[in-house]
């Protein structure tokens, strides 16, 4: 459940501006999800293409309580959404905008071994010191980092990210 003391995570206008997308309807979301099984009511469902195409799950997302969906083709069935050319690129832009709007201390852990353990230790310390945000699980790849950024409340005072890479140049500034 969203903290009532926090602003909405994203409004339709903010998300459209951040992604250069087209907002369909007026909405405000409290979370961002890529999985209908863990989606919470009020979330933005991001229809990423991976082994399966997330567009196939948009109807399930709305049935689970999604407030809107980030899509690249109209599968919204009249529900609110955000239309972009490429969903992953839209998520990346949302993550960049979240970083730009935040003035808190942002840290990252990289390396070959121990990233998750160090990130969890630092997250525990940060939580004790105020409003903190951190990577869920080991979401440290090309979609996990922008997802974690896009989920970061604007009121975050300290954040810790886990960043991994598979190929040279994959980690962007």
Positions of predicted regions on the chain:
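Phosphate-binding loop of NTP-binding sites
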Residues: 14, 91-173
């Amino acid at each position: 459940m969203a903290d009532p003391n926090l602003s909405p995570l994203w409004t339709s206008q903010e998300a459209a501006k951040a992604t250069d997308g087209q907002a369909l309807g007026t909405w405000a979301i409290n979370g961002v999800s890529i999985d209908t099984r863990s989606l919470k009511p009020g979330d933005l469902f991001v229809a990423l293409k991976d082994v399966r195409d997330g567009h196939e799950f948009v109807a399930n997302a709305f049935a689970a309580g999604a407030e809107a969906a980030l899509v690249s083709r109209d599968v919204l069935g009249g529900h609110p959404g955000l239309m972009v050319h490429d969903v992953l690129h839209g998520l990346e832009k949302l993550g960049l905008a979240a970083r730009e709007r935040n003035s808190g201390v942002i840290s990252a852990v990289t390396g070959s071994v121990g990233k998750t353990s160090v990130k969890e230790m630092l997250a525990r310390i940060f939580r004790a010191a105020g409003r903190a945000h951190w990577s869920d699980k080991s979401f440290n790849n090309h979609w996990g980092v922008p997802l974690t950024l896009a989920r970061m409340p604007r009121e975050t005072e300290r954040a810790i990210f886990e960043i991994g890479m598979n190929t040279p140049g994959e980690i962007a500034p």
